[in-house]
Amino acid sequence: PRKPAEAYLRLRTLPGEQSQVDWAHFGHVQIGRAKRALMAFVMVLSWSRQIFVHFYLNARMGAFLHGHVAAFEAWGGVPRVLLYDNLRSAVLNRRGDTIEFNPALLDLAAHYRFEPRPVAVARGNEKDCAA
């Protein structure tokens, strides 16, 4: 017999309250003799599900920060809370409830006045838009 599915409440947010951030891998591209990863920075507004996508040839911190700024400029504003799926660009270390954010992300958050918030480990239901 199949194990019963766990029930979840649908996430409800207000306009401008929250967005969800992640990287997506889109295979590789050939540039000259080099084969490079094609990465998409993805930010989704939780309330409207409006999506922002920007492609990069890596998933380094500079691209991660640039993706945030580009999304904020495209939308003409900054969500109050940004959810992260414990990706290394955002969370350097996590032990229980103790979270060490990447200092560069904290600097960006302080400048743009948003709250970075990681979702619980292995709880994809907490971040249902950009997964």
List each language-model region with its residue ranges.
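RNase H-like two-metal-ion nuclease catalytic core shared by retroviral integrases
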Residues: 84-85, 95-96, 114-131
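Substrate-binding beta-hairpin/strand module that engages nucleic acids
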Residues: 80-84, 89
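Active-site beta-loop-alpha junctions of metal-dependent nucleic acid enzymes
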Residues: 53-81
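Short small-residue beta-strand/loop micro-motif enriched in glycine and branched aliphatics
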Residues: 49-54, 90
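Mobile-element integrase/transposase regions
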Residues: 1-51, 59-63, 67
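Two-metal-ion acidic nuclease core segments, chiefly of the RNase H-like superfamily
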Residues: 98-116
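Short, solvent-exposed loop/turn segments at secondary-structure boundaries
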Residues: 55-56, 93-98
